[in-house]
Curated annotation (Swiss-Prot):
Known function: Binds to actin and affects the structure of the cytoskeleton. At high concentrations, profilin prevents the polymerization of actin, whereas it enhances it at low concentrations. By binding to PIP2, it inhibits the formation of IP3 and DG. Also binds to poly(L-proline) and phosphatidylinositol 4,5-bisphosphate micelles.
UniProtKB keywords: Actin-binding, Cytoplasm, Cytoskeleton
Protein name, per record: Profilin-1
SMART domains registered for this protein in UniProt: PROF
Organs and tissues of expression: Expressed in the nerve ring during late embryonic stages. In adults, expression is seen in the neurons, vulva and somatic gonad.
Disulphide bridges, residue numbers: none
Residue ranges of coiled coil: none
One GO cellular component, as annotated: cytoskeleton
Primary residence: cytoplasm
Taxonomic source organism: Caenorhabditis elegans
Subunit and partners: Occurs in many kinds of cells as a complex with monomeric actin in a 1:1 ratio.
Gene designation: pfn-1
Amino acid sequence: MSGWNAYIDTMTAAAPSIKRCAIVGAADGSVWARTEADNVFKASEEELKTFVALFNDVTQVPAKGADIEGVHYVVPRTEESLIFGKKENTGFFAVKTKSAVLIAVYEGPNEVAAQVRKAVESMQTYLNNAGY
């Protein structure tokens, strides 16, 4: 898992409002890397399996919302490989690569969402280009 932690560090450095994030397997939701210590990403194994399955049909997600780390989020926006969730002053961006799902939970006003999205999508592009 340790090699993947560098990607976690890159995302959190690019968008300091990212409080917790993880890289999980797209097929089964297994955790490849995640934030630790005070900002540990704490989604359960079952929750991650359910979450990665949302990418099978993202068009259905806005009607149902999404759950991550025990929190239910409204999902105002999805794209082919992106899910954006929002709840009060927190939110998440999740993107799918060829073999992974990147999930970044952030805190802050709406203005920080663009920075978080850019950090997550930049890592998505990098991993896709690297074959992941």
